[in-house]
Regions:
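Bacterial N-terminal signal peptides
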Residues: 2-10
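A domain-start/cap signature at the N-terminus of enzymes
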Residues: 14-83, 167-174, 228-230, 240-252, ...
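C-terminal catalytic histidine-bearing segment of alpha/beta-hydrolase fold enzymes
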Residues: 27, 216-222, 238-310
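Gly/Ser-rich "nucleophile elbow"/oxyanion-hole loop immediately N-terminal to the catalytic nucleophile
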Residues: 74-79, 132-170
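Active-site machinery of serine-nucleophile hydrolases
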Residues: 83, 87-147
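Alpha-helical scaffolding within the catalytic cores
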Residues: 101-114, 193-203, 253-256
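Primarily recognizes the serine-hydrolase "nucleophile elbow" in alpha/beta-hydrolase
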Residues: 151-156, 162-206
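Short beta-strand/loop motif that positions the catalytic acidic residue
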Residues: 211-214
Length: 310
């Protein structure tokens, strides 16, 4: 038993990256139990029933992809609706199709009564069978399958293709960056949370509309933010940025976000002060702990829905 325990500890230590991130597939395999978060439990109870589960048969690869889809209540085929594509982190891969919904606030905030009343929209949440992207910028078939799934949904329903939004945390955020490079004209705006990508391919990102939110103590994601800021500056792009504690009252965070948005730029950075995303005990990894904070700010979500390609 002792040798087994030592082996497990060695395996865990060897898969930890600098800054507390787990392996090349950020957040890989781990998940956080949020049953003690009464606000999250209430949101989950309010929103899960709004999603239906389907399977996409991809003709190009012959593979299948399970996914969750929220169709706006009272959907009217004569009207067009925006769509949010949410992709979770690698802690959900290979699990039940609903795992990307139940892992945290991300998809559920867009499905909330509040958001659906303000912004009736489709919410598309794929489930992945494996880590879809790697830190060497390589991708699996499931990445482009996601785009073909999105195209399928847009054909089946009256989706406003001028108001498609991509967002994700960690692995999902990396995919969102990738889509902005490989499908530069597809999305009206993006929300990148706790993630990064190859900035050598981002010279034209100054023309895009996005929020980029990371934790100061998440070395990989905050490093990605720093590198992107440098590329944007080199290409004469404007970046509006702010930093505050994730422990501030929600009302104060909303006010700070609104002040950032009021500057009127198309690129907005938020960096949580180092350590502020962690629980009071100070234990945990800032990377995993930062995901939910990126989605709780209503002002950011409202800004996203105001963006349009027209």
């Amino acid at each position: 038993m002792f040798l087994l325990a030592v082996g497990v500890m060695c395996l865990t230590a060897c898969t930890q990256k600098k800054g507390g991130e787990r392996g090349p597939r950020m957040g890989g395999g781990m998940s956080v139990n949020k049953d003690s978060d009464s606000t999250f439990v209430a949101l989950k109870n309010e929103t899960l029933k709004k999603f239906r589960q389907f399977t996409f048969e991809d003709a190009k690869t012959g593979k299948t992809m399970a996914y969750n889809l929220l169709v706006p209540e009272g959907y009217d085929g004569t009207k067009s609706y925006p769509l949010v594509l949410f992709m979770a982190d690698a802690s959900t891969v290979g699990k039940d199709v609903t795992a990307p919904l139940t892992q945290g606030y991300g998809a559920l905030e867009f499905a909330s009564d509040r958001d659906q009343k303000e912004h009736p929209s489709f919410v598309l949440v794929p489930q992945y069978t494996e880590w879809a992207v790697q830190d060497d910028w390589s991708t699996t078939d499931e990445v482009e399958m996601t785009i073909r799934l999105l195209e399928k949904v847009c054909k089946e329903y009256n989706v406003d293709t001028n108001r498609l939004y991509t967002t994700g945390q960690s692995m999902g955020g990396m995919m969102s960056f990738y889509f902005n490079i490989t499908h530069p004209d597809l999305f009206a705006a993006s929300l990148f949370v706790s993630s990064q990508w190859d900035t050598s391919k981002m010279q034209d990102f100054g023309k895009k509309h996005f929020f980029y939110i990371v934790a100061g103590g998440d070395q990989k994601a905050s490093g990605g933010m720093r590198d992107l800021a440098k590329v944007l500056k080199e290409n004469d792009a404007r970046v509006d940025s702010a930093s505050w504690s994730a422990k501030l009252p929600a009302s104060e965070q909303e006010k700070l976000a609104e002040e950032l948005i009021a500057r009127g730029g198309n690129i907005n950075f938020i960096k949580w002060e180092a350590g502020s995303v962690l629980p009071e005990s100070g234990k945990g990894m800032e990377h995993m702990a930062s995901f939910d904070y990126g989605y709780k700010i209503a002002a950011v979500r409202d800004w996203l829905f105001r963006q349009s390609k027209k």
